[in-house]
Amino acid sequence: VVIGHETTINIMRAYSVPNAQLITVRGGEDYDFGNVSIRVIPSLHSPLNDKRYYQSAVVEEGATHPLRISQLVEGGSLMFLVRLAGHQVLTMGSMNFIERQIEELRPDIVLVGAAPSHLEIYEYTPRLMRALGFPRVVMPTHADNFQAPYGSAIAYRTEWVEAFSEE
């Protein structure tokens, strides 16, 4: 099952993922799938282009593959709180958040965006950790150059993770 905004779902359709496996959300949904439940949390994209990033575009239904990188618009940012076997894992889609949406969450594990754009957000790391009650396990993610070939020397940016960890 793929859960996401309209853009995510339309990209999946372009690549022939069956509609029965697609769930379109906006944020705020909380679904029970039996052994696992997933809460969809509204979020924000990180500030790009000297804090002037705003993109309201979506990938429209009917898009066909292969999609070019210029067609892969943001389409909206979400976080997902996955609950499984008494544990909670929070995964962030970008380097930003809406504080009031997460301040009562207490995930065991959080996957946090760690690219340099998080430095444009006021006290990103301290505010995030306080809001989440200082999770025991914090895994930096999104420290990649998605335009570089997977496995290449510039695909993974170790210095981004190190800078985030020092905060």
Regions found by a protein language model. Give the residues of each.
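Active-site metal-binding motif and surrounding structural segment of the metallo-beta-lactamase
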Residues: 1-14, 18-24, 105-110
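Core dinuclear metal-dependent hydrolase active-site scaffold
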Residues: 25-102
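Active-site environment of divalent metal-dependent phosphoester hydrolases
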Residues: 9-12, 27-32, 46-49, 96-100, ...
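Active-site glycine- and acidic-residue-rich loops that bind
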Residues: 19-21, 112-123
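Binuclear metal-ion centers of metallo-dependent hydrolases, dominated by the metallo-beta-lactamase
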Residues: 16-30, 126-167
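Active-site neighborhood of phospho(di)ester-bond hydrolases with catalytic His/Asp-centered motifs
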Residues: 1-6, 90-94, 110-115, 138-142
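Short amphipathic alpha-helical segments and helix-helix/interface helices
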Residues: 9, 79, 99-102, 125-130, ...
